Every structure is written in C-alpha cells, then in structure tokens.
C-alpha cells in the first residue's frame, strides 16, 4: 500500500487515485532565464522517480510539468542582455532539455508553456472576475481578493490575520488588501503584452500554473508537486484561484521536496550560491549526481558538499563494478519502469524495495537495498554460482532502473565517470581510502603482462596487493575482471 506525505493534511496518507489505475500529476517547472542548478535538478529527479515508481507499480500516469516562459525575471534578463525574450527562453529551454536528458529524466507527457496557454489563462481570469473573486485596480492590473476565499492558508498553515500582522507586504494602493495578488498585469512600455478584455497585458505567475494544470489534467487531479519554496505563496494561491473558479477540490495530494543547501543556506539564483548542473557534470557522472539527490529523503534538506558527491561516486562505482562481465540479459526495467507482474512476488529483495518505496518514496532505504543485492551478487560470483549471479544482476539493474540508475554498461560508466581520486570503499567518514579505479586497472594490466611473460611470481604479487585492498580477480577467456568486496 503506497502512502504519500500530503503537505495539505501534514500526514502520510494512503494513495487512492481519483480514477482507479490512473494517476494525473502536475509539477511546477522552471522559469527559463538561466541554466538549471542543482536545486532544479532535485525537483526534476525527485518527481521523475515518483513517476517511474508509479508506473512500475502498474499505474497509468499522465505527467505534466510546465515551463514558465514569461515572467519579471525573464524580462529583466532579456533587457540586460539586449536580446528578445523568445531568444532567451528558447536557449534555456533547450539547455533544460539537454540537462534532463543527461540526468536520465523521462520527459513529461505534456510540457505546456505559459505563452502558449493564454486562452486558458484569460478564461480563468474572466471566471474569477465574474464570480466576484477578483477586481481591477486603478492601475489596470487585475487582483485576486484573498479575503473572499474562506480556505486561504490551509496548505501553508497560515491565517490571513497572522499574515497581515507579521508579513512585510509592499504597499500598493491599487489593491484592496495588501495580501491580494495579481492575476493580470496591465501592459508597460517595452514589455511583451497580449490582448485581453481588460486591455493589453500579461499574466501573473500564479494564474499560469492554475490554468495550465486544469487545461491539461482537468479541474480535479491526483498529485501536485514542486519545491518547498513554492508551498507559499505560489501553491497556496493556486488553490485559491482554482477552487474559486471551479467550485470544487483542486488537488488531492500535495508533495514538496526539501531545499538543496550550500553553506547552510538554500541554494538559489537570487542568493547567488548555486552550482549549475553543467558545472557539476564537469566533475561527476550524471548518475552520480542522481544517486546523490536520491540518497536523502525527498522531503529532507539535501546538503551539497564534495564529500557527499564523492560518496555517491564511490557507491555507483561499487554497483557497476559488481555488474562487470555479466551479460545484460533481459532486464525487467524499461524506460518507463518495470511492472511488478514481471517480478517474483516472493523475492525478499523485491518485497523490501517495494516496502521502502511505498513508505512515501523512501529512496535512502531503496538505495541501501540495492547495495544488499550487490553484496549478494558478489557472494554468488565468488561461489561460482553463475546462474544466481545472472539472476541477481538482472534484479539489480531492474530495481536500479526504477530509480533511473544503472542504465549504462559497466565499462562505459567506469570509463566515463573519470575516477581520478581514491574512492572510499565505505561511506563512513575518516576510513582509509582504497585504490582508485584507474590504479586498479593499471595493476590489473601489469599483472596481465606478467602472466603473458609467465612471470607467475610477479602476477601473484600483484594479486596479493589487490586482495589486500579487497579486490577480487576473475581470470576469463575475455580477460581479467575485478570487483570490490
């Protein structure tokens, strides 16, 4: 039974879809005025993992993730660089798609853009005006009247009285209440604008997501996700707009991932303390970054440090090393995940993996389970049990595939991951490091030369060095294979 932590109710709840066997899910995507940083990557990886697991569990999923391609920040950046908004956003949308492909993130089923959804946005603004939830200010902007919506603050646990008393709100005489938020901004000189019944202008940020999600998924859908920073005011305002416009419940389950933190602060562009995905991938394989993100529960803060990334690199190296020399066979995972129909329902590894993931997508436990499968695989190989080793390798790749991991051939990963430093054989801090991947390969190559020259003493000496480092060698017709542990 899958249980999801619902930010709206602040507790884990059994997941019951609106329509049996089907899931409709919307996630707030990027505002495309710069490259993706690790905080954006966390949102994409987390909800990609959710989609993969839901599909693996047999659900038919419609996954929508929007692109915000008109916004104050976009306008400012385009003006700063002296280029059109379209040129700026097109470049960063392409970069976004390239980054998500690098991280093995499945593309969403639908990816609406704000600038292509004006009809739906205008229709919702019109509804809110007609129903008395919105008004036009003297400056031509249209605002949402928060005092008109009885449930405002339920998602974030805030009350209007407390917000008015405790929040610093910029004075705007066009508003009836300082907490009212803009739905439609009247056109300003030099800014892009669209025609509307209230004059030319452009949408506010919050109305974009309400209109796009309802346009793609209907007025009531299963899951809405995004970063923790969006819970208030963005998602709070989405609920207010959407439920006022439709008269019914908007979303059943709200999911929010925690911040990525750098030097004890939230990683963000506004603070200037961020690493782009591309900067990280200059030093680490994409699957290492993905493993790093999944190594913390999605609701917990994720501390970005080199040590944590190196630990993830070591873990991925051990997983791939265990798979070296084993033919891929028929994995039970596909690009869409695996179906439990194709697994042995009594397999204890599968049962425990599912138990972890059913507990609000507990990826740290799921990754620990992958490493238990790795240990079992290494033991089978050491015992010469080829059949069991093959079966465990297929299982390891299949379960890893649900997390978006182990998609490469082992030799390709080990080559591409650029293992240039000593890789610790354990995540525990302070333990002695062992030979690097390149160092092991060099010793194996030296031993191969010694064996060709029938210098058995030298070959045995090198085997002994490797054995002391926990490296097991396996001489085959195709060459010498090695693995840790």
Swiss-Prot record:
Subcellular location(s): the record lists:
Cytoplasm
Name a Pfam family for this protein: tRNA-synt_1e
User: From the record, which residues define motif 'HIGH' region?
Assistant: 30-40
Which UniProt key words apply to this protein?
Aminoacyl-tRNA synthetase, ATP-binding, Cytoplasm, Ligase, Metal-binding, Nucleotide-binding, Protein biosynthesis, Zinc
The source's domain of life comes to Bacteria
Motif stretch ('KMSKS' region): 266-270
InterPro entries membership: Cys-tRNA-ligase, Cys-tRNA-synt_Ia_DALR, Cys-tRNA/MSH_ligase, CysS_C, Rossmann-like_a/b/a_fold, tRNA-synt_1_cat_dom, tRNAsynth_Ia_anticodon-bd
Question: Which CDD domains does UniProt cross-reference here?
Answer: Anticodon_Ia_Cys, CysRS_core
Q: What is the reaction catalyzed?
A: tRNA(Cys) + L-cysteine + ATP = L-cysteinyl-tRNA(Cys) + AMP + diphosphate
One GO term of the biological process aspect:
cysteinyl-tRNA aminoacylation
Which co-factors does it depend on?
A: Zn(2+)
The protein's Enzyme Commission number? 6.1.1.16
- Record GO terms (molecular function): ATP binding; cysteine-tRNA ligase activity; zinc ion binding
SUPFAM superfamilies assigned: Anticodon-binding domain of a subclass of class I aminoacyl-tRNA synthetases (SSF47323), Nucleotidylyl transferase (SSF52374)
Cofactor binding annotation = Binds 1 zinc ion per subunit.
Q: Where does Zn(2+) bind?
A: 28, 209, 234, 238
Indicate which residues the UniProt annotation says bind ATP: 269
Q: Name one GO cellular component term.
A: cytosol
Q: Which family does it belong to?
A: Belongs to the class-I aminoacyl-tRNA synthetase family.
What do we know about how this protein assembles, alone or with others?
Monomer.
HAMAP family the record matches: Cys_tRNA_synth
For this entry, the protein name equals Cysteine--tRNA ligase
Q: Which gene is the coding source of this polypeptide chain?
A: cysS
